[in-house]
UniProtKB/Swiss-Prot annotation:
Alphabetized HAMAP family for the sequence: Ribosomal_uS10
Domain of life, source organism: Eukaryota
Classification of source organism: Eukaryota, Viridiplantae, Streptophyta, Embryophyta, Tracheophyta
Subunit structure: Component of the chloroplast small ribosomal subunit (SSU). Mature 70S chloroplast ribosomes of higher plants consist of a small (30S) and a large (50S) subunit. The 30S small subunit contains 1 molecule of ribosomal RNA (16S rRNA) and 24 different proteins. The 50S large subunit contains 3 rRNA molecules (23S, 5S and 4.5S rRNA) and 33 different proteins.
Species for this entry: Spinacia oleracea (Spinach)
Gene name tied to this protein: RPS10
Entry protein name: Small ribosomal subunit protein uS10c
GO molecular function, one term: RNA binding
Amino acid sequence: MATSSISAALLSPLTLRNASSSSTKQDFSTLSSLNLRRTLTPTLQSGHTLSNSSNFATFAAPGALEVLETSPDSFEDGSETSKISIAADSDQMAPKQKIRIKLRSYWVPLIEDSCKQIMDAARTTNAKIMGPVPLPTKKRIYCVLKSPHVHKDARFHFEIRTHQRLIDILYPTAQTIDSLMQLDLPAGVDVEVKL
């Protein structure tokens, strides 16, 4: 009996929402509640609902049922405040300051050692570190003729592989920047810093 009452409570707002869906402007909150109703209502492949089935149980969280009991008009009234709160949350999540360090080298052990030095310097100043992220290796292939004049079939193929790493330092302090400036990185590593 409890199963049919839950599915009836889920189906009745769904039919009301479909009847009043002539407006083209829909909010994110109403769409998410509509998707929630669809996921909570069991359906067969033919599209018929299983609300009359006696051996099927539907479970829902209490918070989901409270969302479904509210009327669609209340979603439209509160949509402006929810959009503002989402924008405020995204501003808080994005760091205001970030140092992006991109390292390039032809030799992998050299670039790995440089990454370790940068990460150790940032950790000592309690800065948050993201990385090192290995970027795709760039291969430049050069084709050179073996002979100086003829015999174009005989060639040498040389390649240069450029390995890259990316490190982000979030919320840097002045002490973090000072410790990064004092690092003595090897000469075979190209360092590009963006603030």
